[in-house]
Amino acid sequence: MKPVIALVGRPNVGKSTLFNRLTRSRDALVADLPGLTRDRHYGEGRVGERPYLVVDTGGFEPVAKDGILHEMARQTRQAVEEADVVVFIVDGRNGLAPQDKSIADYLRKTGRPIFLVVNKAEGMKYTAVATDFYELGLGDPRAISAAHGDGVTDMINEALEVAYAGQPEEADEDDPSRGIKIAIVGRPNVGKSTLVNALIGEDRVIAFDMPGTTRDSIYVDFERNGKKYTLIDTAGLRRRGKVFEAIEKFSVVKTLQSISDANVVILLLDAQQDISDQDAHIAGFVVEQGRALVIGVNKWDGLDDHARDRAKADLTRKLKFLDFAKSHFISAAKKTGIGALMRSVDDAYAAAMAKLPTPKLTRALIEAVEFQQPRRRGPVRPKLRYAHQGGQNPPIIVIHGNALDAVTETYKRYLENRFRETFSLTGTPLRIEFRSSNNPYADKG
């Protein structure tokens, strides 16, 4: 699994700025999705061929006793305990603060690898910036400027060396013969463990722990209607006899890693609760990771018609950026709607892995342009000439032509919808890339 780097520090030291810099290559993929909040706290970064997950823990108040600060501190502690590396950020301009000492005292006790990073160090001599912070007893401070990028690459490379060194070797969880890997994600108490047991059946459980990580990820192999699947633990599911029960302590780290490791994600919602920002954040990460997605709205049997209409409206309004995914209204406890849910899992996986021939893609592109041309930008109208597939899981369609920087986001979404309809790409994100070039086949008979 991808290593996790947790960003920790008191408020206003630049954690979000560093987060944005570390994940910048991914921001564009989700920033323009209608309805998706930009206030994200986790994302993916990449240095060369090494991907990693980043968690921005928010302002850390380790001594908070109640209220929202206490909850933030609890979530931060959990993220720290599950991270591979902790980047502890302090403010070089304001110097050492009492709160920094409290955080350092806590971090030293965790046993996690700690990188002490002095932010806002631009234009300052290292000795002037770093001297105060040696007092924290966390080794040599690393001076950076998250805003300008100074020192960030060296720092993250060092952190990744440590993070990857602690990663276990990938075992047979990557064996393609094991079938579609499914992650069931959602907030506590939405019914994840109930759905797992409904899917697997108590007498057909084949479960084992994959050792080697401090998080003891669990992979559960099962068959349904003759097809093989593997469930990835996301909820702290632990086997008790023949039944899985949830240790209902929501873990951002486990959720992110499970999404990243899955072929298809089932986002499970509680029909009796409003969709939260946390639900939207998780959904946004699924899209960012390019994972196929199916939405399950659980506990549907407990709602009357008015409440059902309200729940559907809430889903449409708050998760409209997931309009490519099928939604199923289910009862995991009564095992209703499970069959249709799993058929959508199969369909979403097939769509994510679809092979799209260049002639058919180009024909679909030409038909889309003939039906609705892209708008001019000033005197220039984009010319879309041909298309080919650039990747799978998720499908990437590369469109070649001229003046493609003038293509609007609205027209890009129009093309996406046309391709989805033509090639039945339901349940998977779809990436469209534009490249200005000549058609190499134009002069060939």
From Swiss-Prot:
Q: Which residues bind GTP 1?
A: 9-16, 56-60, 119-122
Q: Where does GTP 2 bind?
A: 186-193, 233-237, 298-301
Give the GO molecular function terms: ATP hydrolysis activity; GTP binding; ribosome binding
Q: Where is the EngA-type G domain?
A: 3-167, 180-353
All copies of the KH-like domain together span 354-438
* InterPro entries, per the entry: AAA+_ATPase (IPR003593), G_ENGA (IPR031166), GTP-bd (IPR006073), GTPase_Der (IPR016484), KH_dom-like (IPR032859), KH_dom-like_a/b (IPR015946), P-loop_NTPase (IPR027417), Small_GTP-bd (IPR005225)
Q: List keywords of the entry alphabetically.
A: GTP-binding, Nucleotide-binding, Repeat, Ribosome biogenesis
Pfam families named in the record: KH_dom-like, MMR_HSR1
Q: Which GO terms describe its biological process?
A: ribosome biogenesis
**Stated role:** GTPase that plays an essential role in the late steps of ribosome biogenesis.
Similarity section:
Belongs to the TRAFAC class TrmE-Era-EngA-EngB-Septin-like GTPase superfamily. EngA (Der) GTPase family.
Describe its partners and assembly state. Answer: Associates with the 50S ribosomal subunit.
The record's HAMAP family line, in alphabetical order, gives: GTPase_Der
* Protein name stated in the entry: GTPase Der
Organism of origin is Burkholderia cenocepacia (strain HI2424)
The opening ranks of the lineage are: Bacteria, Pseudomonadati, Pseudomonadota, Betaproteobacteria, Burkholderiales
Its gene name is der
